[in-house]
Amino acid sequence: MRTVYICSPYRAKDGAELDRHIEYAQALTKQAIEAGLAPITPHLYMTQCLNEDKPQERAAGMAAGLALLEKCDFVIAGVKYGISEGMSREIQTADALGIEVVNADKLRYYMECKERQRQAAIKRYAHFHACDFCKGRHFHTCALFYCKESCRQAYEYAETHFTSG
């Protein structure tokens, strides 16, 4: 399962806006889970024990969040309500680390593209393990069992070991 970092606004001018931001972060987290991902949404839980209004605690929370971001496969950016200062820092960090940042509105399309890429890589890997006669052909044409069997085994191996992305 791929690990993703959820990036969305948290700071707010008033309680209603804060509630909206929290609900949005929760919805993004649910969307990621439903997509088969393991989301990390630090601003939902770090703010439960750290005071966002105290600069030292905010800095400690941001540092901890960025350390978690480094371990993620990609970042989902929820930009529906704009990009906050904290989000900007998270996105810049992801870019500097070479971690992809995906717009939350495009997550489904992104996941479909990654799955197509994974399937193509699996197929290439399996065909690479075919016999010399069949390499590069769409179908196995030599009718030799060991060629088809080795290709099938390579395909099954690749299917369990290749991740999308």
Predicted regions: what they are:
Residues 1-118:
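Catalytic phosphate/metal-binding cores of nucleic-acid and nucleotide-processing enzymes, i.e., regions
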Residues 116-119, 136-138, 143, 164-165:
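Positively charged N-terminal leader segments that act as targeting/secretion signals
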Residues 119-125:
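Short, intrinsically disordered terminal segments enriched in charged and Pro/Gly residues
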Residues 125, 129-157:
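Cysteine-cluster motifs in flexible loop/terminal segments that predominantly coordinate metals
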Residues 156-165:
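Short, charged early-sequence alpha-helical segments and their helix-coil boundaries
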